[in-house]
């Protein structure tokens, strides 16, 4: 496992972790922006992180039969973790605003399912995946992600999240910006 510092360095070098002043899709402002697609677009660098995350998942979950990844962010990491753990991996996608299984994907009854995401912030997508698992009468093995940037206040997930790295990403309403963030012009272009 890479050190926290080296992990952050990889995320910064791949532009998966940016620092500055950003307006997030929620409308909140933040000095950090995370885009795991940038990490995953460089497989030779993402490989180290994926292998370490797969080891953590294997250590923390006794039984996983299937990996379910919400589209679009979870697809690549779901595939990589599935490959490393030798587990079938499927994804769900939105149709009329709700996650559904398409493309011939299904979840067998009593299957133990791991939900795999790139980043977990509020857990909303993960909890929508839980509905699909329950509807299929399968079992939730747990939750995993490359980055856990959740905070207790906004998190919908009540179970432990296994992540490669936990990053504190403070957010602020536009009328409550700290002085140092007010001085930096903000960017929308990463959304």
Q: Residue locations for each model-derived region?
A:
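PRPP-associated nucleotide enzymes
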Residues: 1-191
